[in-house]
């Protein structure tokens, strides 16, 4: 039962055998209806089937079998699982994502539909309960196995949906503030400070560093979700990524360790001035024109102006936002100031902003491997563009932060479970503790295997797995990772 794919194959074969079995309820599950989402259709059919089998409603096709206690207990369990599945299928985010043209490419929706397929088989198995108690008990073994799989899959679905809803909510909260400021509306920073506290708490709990991304033209998280002006959500995702990085390094800086909220809030607000750059410009895969580049280079100063004008007590934040693209050697923008002229908070933002940007995809390039991104930031610091202290704080994230999906030198795939304490040990970056998820040929491992690569005889981290490859290999089993 641990190998869900194998189980689904057996279910498919079993379903074919059941097609010829006389049914208690004819056509309990309609084939298709353009007006009713398939997940809701199956759920309603399954509920009706269970009610009829357990005698809650009358049926017209002869007497029902007398069910054993075990059969009734399993049907009661099935009803409980069905209620959870129906609730999941009715969530606005799931309904919205299911109605998108590319719904089949969404790992969570694909996973959900496979769960529905297992439930469908459960309906057919329940319909086939015979009169004989001994025969019922044999079928109960199969139904119990299916329900165990459904319970496990529902837990994964619910956990993945909760994470997505949290991501959607965080992006929307920032995007709403950015949109309001762009429309010359006064805003309070209480909601931003609350989000900053959440990110700091995530860092304290050593939760995985997850880089969020939306398209520049995106106006909502899913059809029917909260709508904001473009490119507010795209900018909000990058601001959150930068804030997550700062939340994890601020404790190492003597100046800001005692007041970590300010740097995280500054990171969350640093892109507000970019709202007047058209989404089409940010979505360009080709080089920018001189006018487009000039407009982008004005966004730090414009953001500082918006903060000063529309937010209260924001002078410190405004100074940091105005300088987060300045460089230590004077090659930055908008003012071209250098060295100590740049406030410390601006220099911290610059290092975290650069790292977060490199780790995220852009219309003109894919996301960089986290090791490459960190190396590039350290090189920029070595050449005097970024502050060395703040750049070196990023080493505490390791070349491969906890939660990264990685490919090993022998082709196996896993996720970083922990990094070694001595991050300066040259052997440590490529040899963390990894939870192995797939073999080199893409075969999924039934249960994650934790391996300390520093003690293993083979394998070291080769690279961060690209997003598309991650979805291809892991999406069907681990939608939360894809």
Question: Model-predicted segments: where are they?
Answer:
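Histidine- and acidic-residue-rich, metal-dependent catalytic cores
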Residues: 161-482
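Non-catalytic interface/linker regions that flank or bridge core catalytic/transmembrane domains
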Residues: 1-235, 440, 447-482
